[in-house]
Design a protein with these regions (language model features):
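Surface-exposed assembly/interface segments
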Residues: 1-62, 73, 77, 83-575
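Short beta-strand-centered aromatic/proline hotspots
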Residues: 67-71
Length: 575
């Protein structure tokens, strides 16, 4: 209260009592992988104006020449006319450039994706490009969306500035007759240089030929210098997702720059929430990638879904639980071990499969074949969808999945046989797939990798995730109490807030019981004098009904009712 002189009346408004606690998001997936941003709806051609650049590395222009700004702060004649941010310099005073965005989508920056069929809506999954073989993000987004999930935070690590293959002076020739079109044999091309067969003449894009960089097509231009049927020497680079390394996915922290999986740690500061289901399909079977997922999961209170390699037997998957250095050799209650990989109908484009029709028009050809993909992407979508439909306190187990054809190995599944493959896998903390007659393909397994080493209730996936939601929700809500004067009123307000939250969770079914309390014995005067308060929260989330047992008795005394006239009815038999 102000101590200054006042000849009048004042009103002091003070907020007291409990505050509402908001439940944090539980169903957001964190996805790290590779995406063909260059093929996304509305994406520019390689190295065009809307490909923003920043300091760090030289650019190569469409003719294969190194472009570098010679006059700091201006475009200069030797700098790309379409460059931006000309303010970074090297030791010699020149500005150099590095690709950082494509069509508005930041490389390495976590981006929130909402699953919508409209590719023109900001945050659409379509911004990460179509299904093209070799790129993991579009396939994962399709698997997630098929389960009905709502949102994902995506980190793309594919960068054509780094992940490409260069073709030098490849001998090619235009057709002797018909449409004068040259198929380079790869999608996503840039740095295309077309010369005559001897290499003495360099033809000019836009004058002598036109380029379709997405499909990798060079077309003769009327009036240009290229002649019908001419033999040519062509150099170019093409986007090559096979060049993405596990280290790219793991990422780094350099100053304020977070890349790969590490970038998921930054999302609370930019979006107000963390992803709670972490996947890196196609990469998580690598030990370093799995370790990065788990480390990040510990930091952001998430679960990390880790895949087994394709085509391994159930016995091998179980044995890997005890192989040092294997991704399945963990007892973390944040690790969900996903086995086996799954078959699905691959409708993705073949990046080397572009053909030309009789008019010389490029035709994109889809695989239209059965392929195998990481199980984690379907499990992640199932967890997120069940969170939205039922609640985060429900186990993902026994939930039917869509968009997949079945495991890549044969699994014996039965709820009646303890020796079945799926039961043996569950008994070792492995989440698998259940498929019996008429059941459909179902996520099967309630327990994290903590089981069987850890037998406390938090080895259940649903219990671990429920505790994460409760703990983080309470912590974030307590920010408004930080730095208030310690008093009985403050203690009462905190307890009332937390207990009201717990009661609401009990009412929803997220908790069986629980309460918050303040124990004076845990708060000695010297500790309180240091500004520190300790509260106890006792809660119990509902464990899943994993095993049902019926005690059945054959009771011969029930035969004593036979012959009772009250139990008999007249029956007329027809001849």
């Amino acid at each position: 209260m102000a101590a200054s002189f006042l000849h009048g009346i004042e009103t002091i408004e003070t907020s007291t009592g409990p505050v509402p606690i908001t439940v944090v998001k539980s169903s957001v997936i964190g996805l790290v992988g590779s995406a063909p941003l260059w093929a996304a709806v509305g994406a520019p051609a390689m190295w065009q104006p809307s490909w923003v650049v920043a300091a760090g590395q030289q650019l190569v222009d469409p003719n294969g020449n190194i472009q570098q700004c010679s006059t700091v702060g201006t475009t200069g004649t030797s700098a790309p006319a379409w460059s931006t941010t000309l303010n970074a310099t090297t030791a010699d005073g020149t500005a150099v450039w590095k690709l950082v965005t494509i069509a508005g989508t930041l490389l390495q920056a976590p981006t929130l994706v909402n699953f919508t069929a409209n590719p023109n809506i900001a945050g659409s999954a379509a911004a990460y490009g179509p299904l093209i073989q070799g790129y993991t993000i579009p396939y994962a987004l399709a698997a997630i969306q098929a389960q009905g999930a709502g949102q994902a935070i995506v980190v793309n690590v594919f960068n054509p500035d780094l992940h490409y293959t260069a073709i030098t002076a490849q001998a090619m020739a235009l057709p002797a007759s018909g449409p004068q079109v040259l198929n380079l044999g790869h999608m996503g091309v840039w740095n295309v240089v077309v010369k005559n067969s001897g290499g003495s003449t360099t033809y000019i894009n836009g004058t002598d030929y036109s380029l379709d960089p997405i499909n990798g097509i060079v077309t003769q231009k009327a009036g240009g210098a290229i002649t019908t049927g001419e033999a040519l020497s062509v150099s170019f680079s093409y986007a090559d997702p096979s060049k993405v390394q596990d280290s790219d996915v793991v990422g780094t922290v350099t100053g304020t720059m977070y890349t790969g999986i590490q970038a998921l740690r930054t999302t609370y500061g930019t979006m107000g929430f963390f992803p709670k289901i972490l996947i890196a399909p196609g990469y998580s079977q690598d030990p370093a990638t799995a370790a990065a997922l788990l480390s990040t999961a510990e930091t952001v209170r998430a679960v990390a879904l880790i895949d087994a390699p394709p085509s391994i037997s159930p016995a091998t998957a179980i044995a890997n639980r005890g192989v040092a250095g294997n991704v399945f050799d963990t007892s973390s209650d944040r690790a969900l071990l996903c086995y086996p990989q799954e078959q699905f109908s691959d409708l993705g484009l073949i990046p080397t499969g572009i053909t030309l029709n009789s008019a010389g028009t490029p035709v994109q050809n889809a695989a239209n074949a059965t392929a195998v993909g990481p199980y984690s992407q379907w499990v992640a979508g199932t967890i997120a969808a069940k969170d939205l439909a039922q609640g985060y306190w429900w186990s993902p187990s026994n939930t039917q999945m869509t968009g997949l054809l079945g495991p890549d190995v044969t699994l014996y599944a039965s709820v009646l046989d303890a020796a079945s493959d799926v039961n043996n896998l569950n008994a070792q903390g492995i989440v698998t797939v259940f498929n019996a007659f008429g059941t459909g393909l179902r996520v099967w397994g309630n327990r994290s990798a903590a089981y069987p080493t850890v037998t406390t209730p938090n080895n259940f996936i649903s219990v671990r995730r429920t505790m994460d939601v409760i703990e983080e929700s309470v912590e974030l809500a307590m920010l408004q109490f930080i730095d208030q004067p310690i008093s009985n009123a403050l203690i009462s307000a905190i307890l009332a807030s937390v207990n009201a939250f717990i009661r609401s969770l009990i009412g929803r079914g997220a908790l069986v019981a629980g309460s918050a309390s303040y124990n004076p014995a845990e708060n000695p005067s010297n500790q309180v004098a240091a500004g520190q308060l300790v509260f106890d929260i006792d809660v119990m989330p509902p464990p899943p009904a994993e095993r049902l047992t019926f005690n059945v008795y054959i009771d011969s005394t029930l035969l004593s009712g036979l012959g009772d006239t009250n139990a008999l009815t007249a029956v007329t038999l027809n001849a």
